[in-house]
């Protein structure tokens, strides 16, 4: 049962669903210099109202950053407040901005959406 749960959780984080549609990310990867600003965009699955951002550093599990329900942030308790900003102004596309990147920001930034 543990393996099934792990596979299900991985599919949810990747935004997979039974129709083959998924959460899209722009850009798919980004390399930048220390001190530069980065902007990541998430387009959720059509009709999904909830959107989640996670960060996964090398060798670590996913770390929750922020959760949106519609246009508002329902829980931003994991989002570092000094240089990280996330918005979802129209209840669809969300943008995560990281200002003045640092070495510790190097990670996979994951998005998920749900009904």
UniProtKB/Swiss-Prot annotation:
GO CC, alphabetical: plasma membrane; T cell receptor complex
Lyase among keywords: no
Signal peptide: 1-21
Domain Ig-like: from-to ranges: 22-115
Keywords: Adaptive immunity, Cell membrane, Immunity, Immunoglobulin domain, Membrane, Receptor, Signal, T cell receptor
Principal location: membrane
Cited SUPFAM superfamilies: Immunoglobulin
Keyword Membrane found: yes
Subcellular localization, as worded in the UniProt entry: Cell membrane
GO biological process, one term: adaptive immune response
Record's subunit section: Most probably, the alpha-beta TR is not assembled due to incorrect folding of the beta chain. Alpha-beta TR is a heterodimer composed of an alpha and beta chain; disulfide-linked. The alpha-beta TR is associated with the transmembrane signaling CD3 coreceptor proteins to form the TR-CD3 (TcR or TCR). The assembly of alpha-beta TR heterodimers with CD3 occurs in the endoplasmic reticulum where a single alpha-beta TR heterodimer associates with one CD3D-CD3E heterodimer, one CD3G-CD3E heterodimer and one CD247 homodimer forming a stable octameric structure.
Cited function: Probable non-functional open reading frame (ORF) of V region of the variable domain of T cell receptor (TR) beta chain. Non-functional ORF generally cannot participate in the synthesis of a productive T cell receptor (TR) chain due to altered V-(D)-J or switch recombination and/or splicing site (at mRNA level) and/or conserved amino acid change (protein level). Alpha-beta T cell receptors are antigen specific receptors which are essential to the immune response and are present on the cell surface of T lymphocytes.
Protein name (database record): Probable non-functional T cell receptor beta variable 7-3
Organism: Homo sapiens (Human)
Gene giving rise to this polypeptide: TRBV7-3
